[in-house]
Amino acid sequence: MKFVDEVSIHVKAGDGGNGLMSFRREKFIEKGGPNGGDGGDGGSIYLEADVNLNTLVDYRYTRRFDAQRGENGGSKDCTGAKGDDLVLPVPVGTTVIDANTQEIIGDLTEPGQRLMVAQGGWHGLGNTRFKSSTNRAPRQTTPGKPGEARDLKLELKVLADVGLLGLPNAGKSTFIRAVSAAKPKVADYPFTTLVPNLGVVSVGRYKSFVVADIPGLIEGAAEGAGLGIRFLKHLARTRILLHLVDMAPLDESDPADAAEVIVRELGRFSPALTERERWLVLNKMDQILDPAERDARKQAVIERLGWEGPVYVISALERDGTEALSQDIMRYLDERTLRLEEDPQYAEELAELDQRIEDEARARLQALDDARALRRSGLKNAGAADDDDFDDEEDDGDGPEIFYVP
């Protein structure tokens, strides 16, 4: 199934039913009085988190959803039936945004959680409601109120405990295959991974955590180059990041340079995301046969990054060191959960960090969307509205060229 993590939809709640003007008419009963009933309320629209879904592809082509209208009132004081509510299932981890105001309406992070996104219209009143001591035969009614209509943007962020960072071919997919039952595609060319992959890692008999593998980052990713920028947002809700570095690249490039690229692009995308707990994982060390060279490369990466956090040396292909790493991750997650329960200040600091990451990620992606809209309309920037040839060659010297992948 195709992975879709952003869609725009239009929702329209049902209108309320109209009130009825009616009078009682029976044999031998003169001037029976009003008996027009009220209309029914319009149906509302809800989004519900469904644990069985992992993509928004169902909303890629069907984008308009209307709830049922309330029925009109009937005679004999009969109230019209209420319109049926419409419940739209979405994956757990979906953020709902008002497309016009960019206001966050809600976040569906728990299975079964339900969020109203469009309120059904209020019912109209029948003429019975307007009877009084001075007006015994009212001819006044009210129509039903229109249902709420909204343009929504749905954003899916996968819910994972651990996120994998690295250049293409750093071994992220091989790592997730080594520690879980997930089987993402693995090949010896860049961008083998095109969409996020999730794997459940079992530690012992009763404990487990979820790992998210996103497409590799490249130089200029924060400005839109490559694939990774679209999926960096999925790391916003992870609890720990694993920075994988290919220590034996086929092109014989410097692993320290590759590590710097990831740190730099991560900071450009979201400075707050760099404050997330991050561990350095040096992969493919089994391909370096000389122990002295192995230690030298390891030390070069650590010194170049000024790294002071945990460092792990592994071979994802041979599964060497992966079990110890998984156990340490599980231990960290357990300790983190316990500290969140016991230390309110720590919990508050993490909540603030999470919010900053969400805000920065959304602002960066919105800026890229705006830039793409300008380019599609034939504008290279806001000050060059008269450029009709849509040629961006003069920009090539100022930074990376931006490629958009559908």
Swiss-Prot record:
The keyword Cytoplasm applies. Mg(2+) binds at residues 173, 193. The keyword Chloroplast does not apply. Its cofactor is Mg(2+). Pfam families: GTP1_OBG, MMR_HSR1. It is found in: Cytoplasm. GO terms for molecular function: GTP binding; GTPase activity; magnesium ion binding. Monomer. An essential GTPase which binds GTP, GDP and possibly (p)ppGpp with moderate affinity, with high nucleotide exchange rates and a fairly low GTP hydrolysis rate. Plays a role in control of the cell cycle, stress response, ribosome biogenesis and in those bacteria that undergo differentiation, in morphogenesis control. This is GTPase Obg. It comes from Pseudomonas paraeruginosa (strain DSM 24068 / PA7).
